Amino acid sequence: MIRRLLPRTLRARLTALIILSTAATLALSGVALYSALHNRLVGMSSYEMSATLAAMRTHLANVANVDDIPRKSDLWIDQLHGHQNLDLAIYDTDGRLRFATRGFVAPRPALGAPQTRVPASAAPAGATFSYLADDAPLRGGNPRTARIVVQYDGKNDHALLRAYAYTVVVIEVLAVVLTAALAYGIAMLGLSPLRRLVARAEQMSSSRLAQPLPELDTSGELKEMEHAFNAMLKRLDESFVRLSQFSSNLAHDMRTPLTNLLAEAQVALSKPRTADEYRDVIESSIDEYQRLSRMIEDMLFLARSDNAQSHLAIRTLDAAAQAERVAGYYEPMAEDADVRIVVRGKAEVRADALLYHRALSNLISNALNHAPRGSTITIECAQAADAATISVSDTGRGIEAPHRERIFERFYRVDPARHNSASGTGLGLAIVRSIMENHGGTCGVDSEPHVRTTFWLKFPAHAA
């Protein structure tokens, strides 16, 4: 409800909130101060009446009987010296008035009745007077008590409270008006770095993403927002660069088989051919078609993975047994390349079986492409408390450090000379990374050139 009432702009909202909080604080302060002053005045009036009543009781104790009360009027008047708001009266036990000062106004009859306990007080509704009454013993005579009634005129106190309330209201209204002006200026000043940030952001374009926003002369939340915005620009720039490289590599990789297909078709049609020659052309074209098909399938898989559209059938797998199964698919290729594939260790992974096979298959295929003849490809399964690690190692020429960070990027190849190789699409390792991200795991590579290269997959104990 409050959000709907607040202005939409941040500047107006800050101004309104400052005004509202200031007005509420001033109002509460004014009420508290008014209450404190009122209580103070009530306390002072009660003290004056009680003190005067006590003094009157002391003096009446020396009076012989009620008939002597009117004769000592000067004494009773002296008790009010310095108490300009007080008046008093003395009654006998029959309720007859024996003495009263000039400003005394007769109270309700109950105050004139005899009292046996604590002093009685009263404040008639709508009147400014308040009363305190009590019985006082006399020295002798009959009756032996007299009734004292002390009157306090609160007219001056009420006038003071009204003037104070009026002054407080005027001051608070002026303070709110001044606060509104100051709040607007403070909001404008406080949001000036944000306006500069907005102006700079409006100038951004895809060609200027690499240029960070200027440093703001501020700290705190705006500084954090500036850093977050610059970090976002950096990520966007990196994404645009990768997208540009991806588009370039994709165009180049698709152009090669299309060029081959076109060239073969043109050569085949340049003159009459025998059936065997046409068969050779068609078989060669099929290889290029298959390469294009694999590339498109890999790209579709990555697109589905990036958009989280693939459904994972997560279950517990025997990592070593599944690795043996995948390695069996590559035994014929390994025999042709004179390479052995060995599976070691034991571990359990929480993964989608098909995707686990595909990730491991891509790593084994990659290792076969680089393993020297007569060498061994080792698949190692290791179990830890928080994760299971599956690694594929070969003893090929290895990967230099500058290439390791980018080896899992799409279409990235360490050896440009192999760029047009028909052995792969350049998306195998990118697919591996996508599969691991979908499982909440990680992948990486450790390589010592010309000694050993190990690609590893780390599956968390509880898959995402």
Curated annotation (Swiss-Prot):
Post-translational modification Phosphohistidine, affected residues: 252
**Ranges in the Periplasmic compartment?**
1-13, 188-464
**Location (main, coarse):** membrane
- One term under GO cellular component: plasma membrane
Localized where? Cell inner membrane
The record lists the membrane-crossing segments as 14-34, 167-187
This chain's function reads: Member of the two-component regulatory system IrlR/IrlS. May be involved in invasion of eukaryotic cells and heavy-metal resistance. Probably activates IrlR by phosphorylation.
Q: What is this protein identified as?
A: Sensor protein IrlS
Lineage of the native species?
Bacteria, Pseudomonadati, Pseudomonadota, Betaproteobacteria, Burkholderiales
Q: Which gene encodes it?
A: irlS
